[in-house]
């Protein structure tokens, strides 16, 4: 039986954006991919969700003040 990182209560939700979602995000933010914070392709959670270099990962964290916070990372 393999342990899934995303099943742990302290690990925020990670998901790979589709190509269309990624393009829309970059358009809304008015930036290029290279301007996003990075996450390595060999990061355990990136491996688990099947993220490949060049993908954009959406991270949704629970926040006591905001309720929910969304962050984006470029897989390198």
Curated annotation (Swiss-Prot):
Signal peptide: none
Catalytic activity annotation: RNA(n) + a ribonucleoside 5'-triphosphate = RNA(n+1) + diphosphate
Cellular component annotations (GO), alphabetically ordered: cytoplasm; DNA-directed RNA polymerase complex
EC number: 2.7.7.6
KW Cytoplasm (keyword) present: yes
SUPFAM superfamilies membership: RPB5-like RNA polymerase subunit (SSF55287)
Swiss-Prot/TrEMBL GO biological process terms: transcription by RNA polymerase II; transcription elongation by RNA polymerase I; tRNA transcription by RNA polymerase III
One Pfam family of this chain: RNA_pol_Rpb5_C
Main location: cytoplasm
Assembly and interaction partners: Part of the RNA polymerase complex.
Role summary: DNA-dependent RNA polymerase (RNAP) catalyzes the transcription of DNA into RNA using the four ribonucleoside triphosphates as substrates.
Full protein name: DNA-directed RNA polymerase subunit Rpo5
Organism of origin: Archaeoglobus fulgidus (strain ATCC 49558 / DSM 4304 / JCM 9628 / NBRC 100126 / VC-16)
């Amino acid at each position: 039986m393999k342990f899934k990182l995303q099943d742990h209560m302290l690990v925020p939700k990670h998901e790979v954006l589709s190509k269309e979602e990624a393009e829309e995000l970059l358009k809304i933010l008015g930036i290029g991919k290279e301007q996003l914070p990075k996450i390595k392709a060999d990061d355990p959670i990136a491996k688990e969700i099947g993220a490949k270099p060049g993908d954009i990962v959406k991270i949704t964290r629970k926040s006591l003040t905001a309720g929910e916070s969304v962050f984006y990372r470029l897989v390198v």
